Swiss-Prot record:
Keywords assigned: Cytoplasm, DNA-binding, Repeat, Transcription, Transcription regulation
HAMAP family: MraZ
Protein name, UniProt field: Transcriptional regulator MraZ
Family note: Belongs to the MraZ family.
Subcellular location: Cytoplasm, Nucleoid
Molecular functions (GO terms): DNA-binding transcription factor activity; transcription cis-regulatory region binding
InterPro entries in the cross-refs: MraZ, MraZ_C, MraZ_dom, MraZ_N, MraZ_sf, SpoVT-AbrB_dom, SpoVT-AbrB_sf
Length: 146
């Protein structure tokens, strides 16, 4: 398994750390990801987390564009200005910093959400609400196509 799949909610400890789900840690190990690149998602109130390959993908998009274009500058603001590197501790925990809390609204628990090549950190109720909304919209889209 080399994809981040499913979701899990874990409690933040008294020191502000949260355990990354074992299934996600095994993907990180399998993909030899030791330093995590985190950025504020472009659409959702979530922090997207992946390896350097995730950052590289965005930087290739910027390089393919005119570096002085508004689109390239906006992308750089989002992925560089809205990104940080973090590491897991020896027990597989992630420090839930103000960078994460302020953008997501996370307080006591974190929902980890698999997104195939990366995962996201969500405030649990926000994830549940947006997942239910997405499910309902897909259901309605299916009815319209009949």
């Amino acid at each position: 398994m080399n994809r981040f799949l499913s979701n899990a909610t874990n409690r933040i400890d008294a020191k502000g750390r949260v355990s990354v789900p074992a299934a996600f840690r095994s993907v990180l190990t399998e993909r030899n990801i030791q330093e995590l690149y985190c950025f504020q998602d472009f659409v959702f109130p979530a922090i997207s987390v992946g390896g350097l390959d995730l950052l590289d993908r965005f930087e290739r998009q910027i390089a393919a564009d005119d570096p002085f274009s508004p689109a390239a500058n906006q992308m750089s603001l989002l992925i560089h200005g809205g990104g940080v590197f973090v590491r897991l501790d020896a027990e597989g925990r992630l420090m839930v910093t103000d960078f994460i809390r302020d953008f997501t609204g996370i307080t006591n628990e974190v929902t980890f959400v698999g997104r195939a090549d990366h995962f996201q950190l969500w405030q649990p109720e926000a994830f549940q609400a947006l997942q239910a909304q997405a499910r309902e919209e897909r259901k309605l889209a299916g009815r319209r196509s009949e």
